[in-house]
UniProtKB/Swiss-Prot annotation:
This is Glycine--tRNA ligase beta subunit. One of its GO terms (biological process) is arginyl-tRNA aminoacylation. GO terms for cellular component: cytosol. It comes from Rickettsia peacockii (strain Rustic). The keyword DNA-binding does not apply. One of its GO terms (molecular function) is ATP binding. Keywords: Aminoacyl-tRNA synthetase, ATP-binding, Cytoplasm, Ligase, Nucleotide-binding, Protein biosynthesis. The gene is glyS. The keyword Magnesium does not apply. It comes from the Bacteria. Its EC number is 6.1.1.14. It is found in: Cytoplasm. The lineage of its organism: Bacteria, Pseudomonadati, Pseudomonadota, Alphaproteobacteria, Rickettsiales. Belongs to the class-II aminoacyl-tRNA synthetase family.
Length: 664
């Protein structure tokens, strides 16, 4: 069996694109090989400067095959038949016909001759290279090929020989290159083993998994050796794997003078900008040490460490300067600057958004002065030097600046946490922070939907689905008893376009997100039966109804409700129950129980005691069963029949006070 080796050698490929490219090219090559009946074992390796394909077990020749291509029917217009003939370069007389569903159709038999595999590989390879779609790609120079970064070389070897192939301006050869910094020289290779070994000798580890294992092991061992803790950060690990061809883990130290900076600034500088790993002591406290991944061998580790510490110091010096500049101004004094920052083209600036958030906070919690102060100042840090340089520190810098100004801890914490939660795994804020976060998210949700930014399909550029889930989690986890319908009305009225159409759109969207949230724990029919805009009530009802319907009595009662509902059907029952028309004991007993429990159920619902309400409904089971077993609803006397239908209507209405049982 044969072996194919292909390397696309380029300028630096973005780290976050490499893993997807590895998986994408693997799928593409595998599929194209199979389409050509080449059943090979395929591997793809992605690194900072190369995408490599290794395929084994390729046949030396492709077998001849025939493929039938269906054409038009023999009764089709002559132009259609002639077009089919022209497409396949045959005359009508040469085309066989086949009977399909009592209709004759022309067919063309496409024959593929036996070919040597090396003859068809170049066209297959070029097709596969072009088929992968990078998230971003580019042209360069005067060349017509397009790729993620400029391609510099193509290595292509089949069974130890260069496979003649041209891709754009590049002609395939048997050359690769070693490590960019230390061994950037031409390496002639003969096959995959030779290729992998020569790369390793020249400080390039081909396999992504090996580089990842080296980094993870190095991080853990070096942290442990200094009795420090490194927090799991798979995303950063994946990124540095894509930045290094020959990774070596080293430990550095933050200069003492920068430790006066907030730890979040230090962490952001190291993680986001420098791709360093922060270290903590065994009690979880931040330490002045960090780990980093060096790309390539070196003779003097201390020199490499000093170089990285120097780069970090330069960045932290900027941060320290920005911090000192920022604290020269108060958060209040920055409000005017927010007028120059657009929230949305149709919704005005951030100063206007602040005013709406403040109004919503005042509506939710009147006379809460700390909350109102936090609402006024919560966006001020967006125009600070620090947040301009480190956008991920929004809210956090506002917290530190508020503390520096002497504002109380409740105000500072609300400013810090009002962006939370930013996903299902993020913590939900509490206290004033929860109310401020709710107001901010609600204003964004309402405003952006009024502006026509409602999510469609997979598109959600303003993360409104996440905003809605954040609102839901804040309400539920803080047990906020809110009239959400009134709250949405209030928020909508803060905008000029407060139409009923917009309100209905927002409520419908919010209800769908609530269903999405609850469906992890509850059946969708159960959710539909109890969902309303009071999420606390909804949650209580879901718990009680789920437990109730697990029991046999609950299942039997639901069946009794459905039977009553089916008998009524689409009939409009308007008359009251007339006890004087009862002629049997079962209907008398049933009516007596209904009259007895109706006010108790209403009181239980008012008290939000849904378990009691369901238990009261259970007392209907025996009389309902007796009624259905012994009574014919459609009596020959129309008055009696109508009265019995009214009785069943009473039952259904009583059930529906607790939940929409018709949706179960």
């Amino acid at each position: 069996m044969s072996e194919l080796l292909l390397e696309l050698f380029s300028e630096e490929i973005p780290a976050f694109m490499q893993k997807n490219a590895e998986e994408g090219y693997l799928n593409i090559f595998t599929k194209i090989f199979e389409e050509n009946e080449i059943f090979a074992k395929v591997q793809v390796f992605a690194g900072p400067r190369r995408i490599t394909l290794h395929a084994t077990h390729l046949p030396k020749i492709t077998l001849p095959k025939e493929e039938e291509i269906k054409g038009p029917s023999i009764e089709a217009p002559e132009t259609a038949i002639n077009g089919f003939c022209k497409a396949h370069n045959v005359s009508k007389l040469e085309l066989p016909t086949k009977l399909i569903s009592n209709q004759l159709y022309y067919f063309f038999v496409k024959k593929t001759e036996e070919r040597e595999i090396k003859e068809i590989l170049p066209e297959i390879i070029i097709e596969a290279i072009n088929k992968y779609s990078w998230a971003k790609s580019m042209f360069w120079g005067d060349y017509k090929i397009k790729w993620i970064r400029p391609l510099r070389n193509i290595l292509c070897i089949f069974n130890g020989e260069i496979l003649p192939m041209q891709f754009g301006h590049l002609t395939a050869n048997n050359i690769t290159y070693g490590h960019r910094l230390t061994d950037n020289k031409k390496l002639e290779v003969t096959d995959f083993e030779d290729y992998r070994n020569k790369l390793l000798e020249n400080h390039v580890i081909l396999e992504r998994a090996k580089r990842e294992a080296i980094i993870k092991t190095g991080l853990l061992e070096l942290a442990n050796s200094h009795e420090l803790i490194i927090k799991e950060d798979n995303r950063l690990v994946e990124e540095v794997v894509g930045l290094s061809e020959f990774p070596i883990v080293l430990l550095g130290k933050i200069p003492q003078k920068f430790l006066e900076l907030p730890k979040e600034v230090l962490i952001s500088s190291m993680r986001t900008h420098q791709k360093y790993f922060c270290l903590f002591d065994k009690t979880g406290n931040f330490t002045p040490y960090f780990l980093f991944v060096s790309n390539g061998r070196f003779t003097n580790a201390e020199l490499v460490i000093q170089g990285n510490e120097k780069v970090l110091s330069a960045r932290l010096s900027d941060a320290l300067y920005f911090c000192k500049q920022d604290i020269a101004k108060t958060l209040e004094s920055r409000l005017g600057q927010l007028e120059a920052v657009t929230f949305h083209a149709k919704l005005g600036n951030l100063r206007e958004k602040i005013e709406r958030i403040t109004d919503i906070c005042n509506y939710i919690a009147p006379n809460n002065k700390d909350l109102i102060t936090a609402a006024r100042l919560c966006k001020s840090d967006l125009v600070s030097e620090m947040v301009w340089e480190f956008p991920d520190l929004q809210g956090i810098m506002g917290y530190y600046y508020a503390k520096h100004e002497g504002l109380n801890a409740e105000i500072a914490a609300a400013i810090k946490d009002h962006y939370k939660p930013q996903g299902l795994s993020d913590n939900v804020p509490s206290g004033n922070a929860a109310l401020l976060a709710l107001a901010d998210k609600l204003d964004s949700l309402v405003g952006l939907m009024i502006a026509g930014e409602t999510p469609t399909g997979s598109g959600d550029p303003y993360a409104l689905r996440r905003q809605a889930l954040g609102i839901i989690r804040i309400i539920l986890e803080n047990k906020l008893e809110l009239n959400f319908n009134d709250l949405i009305n209030f928020s909508i009225n803060l905008y000029k376009d407060s139409s009923d159409e917009n309100k209905n759109l927002i409520i419908s969207f919010f209800e769908e997100r609530a269903k999405f949230y609850f469906k992890n724990d509850y059946d969708i029919a159960l959710i539909n039966a109890v969902l309303d805009l009071n999420l606390i009530d909804t949650n209580f009802k879901l718990d009680e109804l789920k437990e109730f319907l697990i029991e046999d009595a609950g299942k039997q009662l639901l069946n009794a409700y459905k039977r009553a509902s089916n008998i009524i059907g689409d009939q409009k029952i308007t008359g009251l129950v007339d006890a004087s028309l009862f002629s049997t004991q079962p209907e008398k007993e049933l009516f007596e129980v209904i009259q007895k429990i109706s006010p108790e159920i209403i009181d239980s619902i008012a008290d939000k005691d849904y378990k009691k309400a369901l238990n009261l409904l259970s007392s209907l089971l025996t009389p309902i069963t007796s009624f259905f077993d012994n009574i014919l609803v459609n009596d020959s006397d129309p008055k009696i029949a109508q009265n019995r239908l009214s009785l069943l209507q009473n039952i259904c209405e009583l059930f529906d006070k607790v939940a929409k049982f018709n949706r179960l």
